[in-house]
Amino acid sequence: MRFTFTRQFLAFFILISNPASILPRSENLTFPTFEPEPYLYSVGRKKLVDAQYRCYDRMQQLPPYEGEGPYCNRTWDGWMCWDDTPAGVLSVQLCPDYFPDFDPTEKVTKYCDESGVWFKHPENNRTWSNYTLCNAFTPEKLQNAYVLYYLAIVGHSMSIITLVVSLGIFVYFRSLGCQRVTLHKNMFLTYILNSMIIIIHLVEVVPNGELVRKDPVSCKILHFFHQYMMACNYFWMLCEGIYLHTLIVVSVFNEAKHLRWYYLLGWGFPLVPTTIHAITRALYFNDNCWISVDTHLLYIIHGPVMVALVVNFFFLLNIVRVLVTKMRETHEAESYMYLKAVKATMILVPLLGIQFVVFPWRPSNKVLGKIYDYFMHSLIHFQGFFVATIYCFCNNEVQTTLKRQWAQFKIQWNQRWGTRPSNRSAAARAAAAAAEAGGDNIPVYICHQEPRNDPPNNQGEEGAEMIVLNIIEKESSA
């Protein structure tokens, strides 16, 4: 499968040959024509030759025109094939995708006049097809590309900052340590590395036309690690889904050795499709810096990723099913029950990446397509920010741990530097609050609400289901 959002980034890649300002100006609305990269240019020429061959073969195979009245003969205009057309009819086709400066979503037209002759341009009196709408670099499209470009930079920058802070919290506070948090830390790390590589690519490779023309090995290595970290990111989402689903159907894993399978799936398996893609890309579609998305070889990576997302989608449905079932058993009000189910679903969606399954295709309508672009790009680039916020900063146990640490810090500060009597009483209250917050107890629900000394494997299936129920309910209320 080819993700629809990757095609949108093609607009960014195209900008590499035009590093100067290309937004519309009142004194100059003429934009330079994109100079294709050598490999992509040869691919486009091959597409053009193949289309011409198919056109002439088609013209020979089609039966003679059987309509009444004058008509325009079937023809090849140098770019596209046109069938026999009745007089007075405007033929319309989608623009070809031979070169990057062609927008295949736009339309090309050719008019057959009333006398049955293809329209001729008045300036040169030659047969003319209208390809003007095929230009991929109109001011509006370029401005939209710039907006998406800076949206990507801002989103991934904010994701890196929040994820680094979240990862630091999980690493520093050992009381938060458990298998589920270990999975969180690994997934956070993939978000951080993936966002860093994307920013490097957008800042150093995309605007540098000279670098892309030279086609150094380093930019292809960067692309390899970008694809690898992207795959790792989605497979660690799958690990999170497997772990949560396991809490429902079997008892909770307690031995650390089980984590090795998650490490193998999250870090090891993505190497397989990424390596295969790199080898086949070098052999069969070796474009400059591997920036083109017009190749089916991307299915090698995106196929397994899509499978992981679909599996997580079914995990989500089953988790919500269990949540609704348990709330029915507790005889909660129906409206409140469904409200909690919706909240739990919204909490799990950014963790499991389900939005890419729910909205897999871009609408063909221009307005809806633009809305889809901004919506999906916001989810993609800010997903790390959302995950860090929901699963760390809004987590009750993390907040309790931070409050306890802050209270202890104030106590130590006051003891070191001395305080007035009123401040001493405040420090005493802070100490009492810190002790009440949990002391040395293991976190309550971030680690499945397991008491430290109780064997987790004795809870059975129902106990495991209630653990997940408590996790989701408390995180959704955070």
Swiss-Prot record:
Alphabetic keyword roster: Cell membrane, Disulfide bond, G-protein coupled receptor, Glycoprotein, Membrane, Receptor, Signal, Transducer, Transmembrane, Transmembrane helix
Record PANTHER family: CALCITONIN RECEPTOR, PDF RECEPTOR-LIKE PROTEIN-RELATED
Regions that span the bilayer: 147-169, 182-202, 220-242, 260-280, 297-320, 341-359, 368-394
Cytoplasmic side: 170-181, 243-259, 321-340, 395-478
Function statement: G protein-coupled receptor activated by ligand peptides amylin (IAPP), calcitonin (CT/CALCA) and calcitonin gene-related peptide type 1 (CGRP1/CALCA). CALCR interacts with receptor-activity-modifying proteins RAMP1, 2 and 3 to form receptor complexes AMYR1, 2 and 3, respectively. IAPP, CT and CGRP1 activate CALCR and AMYRs with distinct modes of receptor activation resulting in specific phenotypes. Ligand binding causes a conformation change that triggers signaling via guanine nucleotide-binding proteins (G proteins) and modulates the activity of downstream effectors.
Disulfide bonds: 55-81, 72-112, 95-134, 219-289
Matching Gene3D superfamilies: GPCR, family 2, extracellular hormone receptor domain, Rhodopsin 7-helix transmembrane proteins
Glycosylation sites: 28, 73, 125, 130
SUPFAM superfamilies linked to this entry: Family A G protein-coupled receptor-like (SSF81321), Hormone receptor domain (SSF111418)
Gene Ontology MF: a single term: calcitonin receptor activity
Topological category with respect to the lipid bilayer: Multi-pass membrane protein
UniProt GO BP: adenylate cyclase-activating G protein-coupled receptor signaling pathway; cell surface receptor signaling pathway; positive regulation of cytosolic calcium ion concentration
GO CC annotations, alphabetized: axon; plasma membrane
Species of provenance: Cavia porcellus
Protein name, per record: Calcitonin receptor
Pfam families for the chain: 7tm_2, HRM
Coiled-coil parts of chain: none
Assembly mode: Heterodimer of CALCR and RAMP1, RAMP2 or RAMP3; the receptor complexes function as AMYR1, AMYR2 and AMYR3 receptors, respectively, and respond to amylin/IAPP, calcitonin/CT and CGRP1 ligands. Interacts with GPRASP2.
Similarity comment: Belongs to the G-protein coupled receptor 2 family.
Position of the signal peptide: 1-22
Extracellular topological segments: 23-146, 203-219, 281-296, 360-367
CDD domains: 7tmB1_calcitonin_R
Compartments where located: Cell membrane
